[in-house]
Amino acid sequence: MMTSEKDTEQNEELNEKQKPPVSMAGRVAATGFCGGVLWSFVAYIAYLFHFSEISPNMILQPFVLGEWKKHGLGTVISIILIGVISIGAAFLYFLLLKRLKTMWPGILYGLVLWLLVFFVFNPIFPDVRTVTELTSDTIITTICIYLLYGLFVGYSISFEYNELNSEKLARALGMHRE
């Protein structure tokens, strides 16, 4: 019985070693997409419970015609589209801030993204009022969601980057990491 367990463990170890590791770019893209989908879904829930006046499908407003964009299909497409756009934001974080190991750069990154969306890109979205016209509930809710998005993406990318570097260092020094 013991030999079959050992054989199974050895086979699992061989399979893990034979699998090609996921590239850092793949990890960044996955983190960005998942972060965008997760936090835009949270934003949609906040919209449903009237914590925010802004729904994720605001992203479709200037580019797509029809009323369908304000309903279920429009919301799903918007959440996925935000996930795709978020891949670019994740790569931007990776290029600029990946070496920083604390949570604060991610939180500040989320704040910068909020400022960009609500001050710089606001004129693109005709259905979104200016920040001075939004309710305080909307402002606070959206800031919190952007801060959490920045924390999620930033800390995940920094962790993966530093973990990958420590694995490379351990291999270079001939040490085995678990």
From Swiss-Prot:
Gene Ontology cellular component terms for the protein in this record: plasma membrane
User: Per its UniProt record, what InterPro entries does this chain match?
Assistant: YqhR
Q: Where are the transmembrane segments?
A: 29-49, 76-96, 105-125, 139-159
Q: Indicate how the chain sits in the lipid bilayer.
A: Multi-pass membrane protein
Q: Which UniProt keywords apply?
A: Cell membrane, Membrane, Transmembrane, Transmembrane helix
* Chief subcellular location: membrane
Location in the cell: Cell membrane
Q: What is this protein called?
A: Uncharacterized protein YqhR
Lineage, uppermost ranks: Bacteria, Bacillati, Bacillota, Bacilli, Bacillales
